[in-house]
A protein has these predicted regions:
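N-terminal secretory signal peptides that target proteins for export/translocation
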Residues: 1-11
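Bacterial N-terminal signal peptides
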Residues: 11-26
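Compact, glycine-rich, soluble single-domain proteins
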Residues: 30-165
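Absolute protein N-terminus
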Residues: 1, 28-29
Length: 165
């Protein structure tokens, strides 16, 4: 057993790729609801003096042949959750607006990240979100139904992307 640990330690020191894989696996978590896969729900730590926050999914995927939509989310850490998108308007200004759902076409993948595209706005936080904290969130999909996920508060997310994949 001791030689196995020595081998693994040596492999980690020699291979940045192995180290990156192990680090990414440490952050990985998610849920599945029918054909919907929710990969790594996360939120960013609160900025000082703010009462709102944001949550994201490193990956939201519809593996099925039927379209679905995320239509609602709730969490005990905020008064309400709004589904939002960000886009540049005709004047070249980035604007955030509430939307009535996040569409998932068959076999679609959506990646969310701070400052780009879609996110879940946590309105009226009951206390600031601190790095490393976890909180529950219930997601409701138009077809697939409801699922409870755990959101992890992190400053940086390995492998996070933005927009539809």
């Amino acid at each position: 057993m001791k030689s196995l640990f020595a081998f693994l330690a040596a492999a980690l020191r020699r291979s940045p790729l192995v180290l990156a894989f192990v680090a990414a696996a440490a952050f990985a978590h998610g849920s599945t609801l029918g054909d919907i896969e929710i990969g790594h729900p996360y939120a960013t730590p609160s900025l000082p003096g703010t009462s709102n926050g944001a949550a994201y999914f490193a990956m939201l995927e519809n593996t099925g042949n039927t379209a679905d939509r995320l239509v609602r989310a709730t969490t005990p850490v905020a008064a309400r959750v709004e589904l939002h998108t960000m886009a540049v308007d005709a004047q070249g200004v980035m604007r955030m607006r509430e939307i009535d759902g996040i569409a998932l076409a068959p076999h679609a993948k959506i990646r969310m990240r701070p400052g780009m595209g879609m996110h879940l706005m946590l309105v009226g936080l009951k206390e600031p979100l601190k790095d490393g904290a976890r909180f529950p969130m219930r997601l409701e999909f138009e077809r697939a139904g409801k699922v409870d996920v755990t959101v992890i508060v992190r400053s940086a997310i390995p492998g996070g992307g933005g927009g539809a994949a």
